[in-house]
Amino acid sequence: MTIADNKKAFFDYFIEERFEAGIVLEGWEVKAIRAGRVQIKEGYVVVRDAEMFLIGAHISPLQSASTHVNPDPVRTRKLLLKADEIKKLIGKVEQRGYTLVPLNLHYTRGRVKCEIGLGKGKKLFDKRETEKQRDWQREKSRIMKGGSKE
C-alpha cells in the first residue's frame, strides 16, 4: 500500500533502476506516516561513508507528539540496503549525470519502506516531450470515449 508518491521524480528524471530500502525512523515519525503526514517531493538520497541517507523528506509531527521528544520534520534519515546494492549504487552515482531520488513510501509486511530510483536528469526538451505525450494520451482517450463536444 502506497503512503506517498513522488510524481516530480518521474517528471525530472529518467528512472532506470528501482530499489526498496528500509528507513530508520523514530516512534513519532511512524505515527505521523501512518496518519499520512509525509511529503517526499523535495527529498533526495546521498551516499556518505558507504551508507545512504534520505534528506529533505518532510514528516509533520502529530499534535499529540510526546513532550520529551523534540520532533525535527526534515531530519536526515538513514536508508537500509544490502551491502552489494549500496556498492552497485555508489558505482552508478559516481558516473556523470546519475542521481538517487525517493520514488514512494509504502508498507511491506507492516514496515515502512522507501522505493528509491536511480535516475538520469531530463533536459528541458525531454520534459516538453513528456508533456506532449501525456496531452496526446489524454486527447486520444477523449476521442475514443465519445468524441469532443464542439
Swiss-Prot record:
NCBIfam families, per the entry: PRK05422.1 (NF003843), smpB (TIGR00086)
UniProt keyword terms in alphabetical order: Cytoplasm, RNA-binding
Alphabetized HAMAP family for the sequence: SmpB
The name this protein goes by in its record: SsrA-binding protein
Pfam family, one: SmpB
Taxonomic source organism: Cupriavidus pinatubonensis (strain JMP 134 / LMG 1197) (Cupriavidus necator (strain JMP 134))
Major localization class: cytoplasm
Lineage of origin: Bacteria, Pseudomonadati, Pseudomonadota, Betaproteobacteria, Burkholderiales
InterPro entries membership: SmpB, SsrA-bd_prot, SsrA-bd_prot_CS
GO biological process, one term: trans-translation
Gene Ontology CC annotations of this record: cytosol
Top-level taxon of the source organism: Bacteria
Annotated SUPFAM superfamilies: Small protein B (SmpB)
Residue span of region Disordered: 129-150
Subcellular location, record wording: Cytoplasm
MF term (GO), any: RNA binding
Job description of the protein: Required for rescue of stalled ribosomes mediated by trans-translation. Binds to transfer-messenger RNA (tmRNA), required for stable association of tmRNA with ribosomes. tmRNA and SmpB together mimic tRNA shape, replacing the anticodon stem-loop with SmpB. tmRNA is encoded by the ssrA gene; the 2 termini fold to resemble tRNA(Ala) and it encodes a 'tag peptide', a short internal open reading frame. During trans-translation Ala-aminoacylated tmRNA acts like a tRNA, entering the A-site of stalled ribosomes, displacing the stalled mRNA.
Family assignment from sequence similarity: Belongs to the SmpB family.
Residue ranges that the Swiss-Prot or TrEMBL entry lists as coiled coil: none
Keyword Repressor attached: no
